[in-house]
């Protein structure tokens, strides 16, 4: 049985033409106008792509620093030692460690948003796969979180880097700001995401690549984008 939406959602939904594709700036403004959460809600974009995720070369995964950030303070941890640990601390990492950090997570601590590791630490970090993997926190070279340049990785994470990846149905969902953001800044963030997804088009894909895109705020209805207006 489908979950019945509340009155605030229904009122917001009435302001959206479900048959219309909105120009990007108009869509962003509309989502801001109809947001009703009693906190500064996040705005997210969802791209539906014409990809076969059973094919390894059609699985998208990566990271991008949004020009205007995400509005969220990221708690960043780094698995490193020696000079790399020092560099991570100087770059602003919240927690830096080696075996001690691995043990802390094994004991159930998960109060962080981004995990970064130097390549030599991955055999140890790999033991955390069952914990970090399902939560999307496992360091990965494709997202720039397995790297020797931990200072840059920490700076990027703190500056508003977001990660993206296709789910099994070819969808990519990424947050790109808060309702409180200026409309133009949200549009700039959204355009950055659209550009990175478009450039990541697998060579083997034929026909239309981005089939559909919509944006929504936390709890709010989605608004379909006119992809020609990017």
Swiss-Prot record:
GO terms for cellular component: large ribosomal subunit. The keyword RNA-binding applies. Gene3D superfamilies: 3.30.190.20, 3.40.50.790. One of its GO terms (biological process) is translation. InterPro entries: Ribosom_uL1_bac-type (IPR005878), Ribosomal_uL1 (IPR002143), Ribosomal_uL1-like (IPR023674), Ribosomal_uL1/biogenesis (IPR028364), Ribosomal_uL1_3-a/b-sand (IPR016095), Ribosomal_uL1_CS (IPR023673). It comes from the Bacteria. GO terms for molecular function: rRNA binding; structural constituent of ribosome; tRNA binding. The keyword Ribosomal protein applies. Signal peptide: none annotated. Keywords: Repressor, Ribonucleoprotein, Ribosomal protein, RNA-binding, rRNA-binding, Translation regulation, tRNA-binding. It holds the Pfam family Ribosomal_L1. Belongs to the universal ribosomal protein uL1 family. PANTHER family: 54S RIBOSOMAL PROTEIN L1, MITOCHONDRIAL, LARGE RIBOSOMAL SUBUNIT PROTEIN UL1M. Part of the 50S ribosomal subunit. Binds directly to 23S rRNA. The L1 stalk is quite mobile in the ribosome, and is involved in E site tRNA release. This is Large ribosomal subunit protein uL1. The lineage of its organism: Bacteria, Bacillati, Bacillota, Bacilli, Lactobacillales. The gene is rplA.
């Amino acid at each position: 049985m489908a979950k019945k939406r509340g009155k605030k959602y229904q009122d917001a939904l009435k302001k959206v033409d479900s048959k219309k594709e909105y120009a990007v700036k108009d869509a962003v403004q509309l989502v801001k106008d109809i947001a009703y959460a009693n906190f500064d809600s996040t705005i997210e974009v969802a791209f539906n792509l014409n990809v076969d995720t059973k094919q390894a070369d059609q699985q998208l995964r990566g990271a991008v620093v949004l020009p205007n950030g995400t509005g969220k303070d990221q708690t960043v941890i780094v698995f490193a030692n020696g000079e790399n640990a020092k560099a991570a601390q100087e770059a602003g990492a919240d927690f830096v460690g080696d075996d001690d950090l691995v043990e802390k997570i094994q004991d159930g601590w998960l109060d962080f948003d981004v995990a970064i590791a130097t390549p030599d630490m991955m055999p140890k970090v790999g033991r955390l796969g069952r914990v970090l993997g399902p939560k999307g926190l496992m360091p990965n070279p494709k997202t720039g979180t397995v790297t020797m340049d931990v200072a840059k990785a920490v700076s990027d994470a703190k500056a508003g880097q977001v990660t993206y990846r296709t789910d099994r149905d070819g969808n990519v969902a990424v947050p790109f700001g808060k309702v409180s953001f200026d409309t133009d800044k949200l549009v700039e963030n959204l355009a950055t995401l659209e550009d990175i997804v478009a450039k990541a088009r697998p060579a083997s894909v034929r026909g239309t690549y981005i089939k559909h895109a919509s944006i929504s705020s936390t709890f709010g209805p989605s608004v379909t984008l006119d992809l020609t207006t990017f």
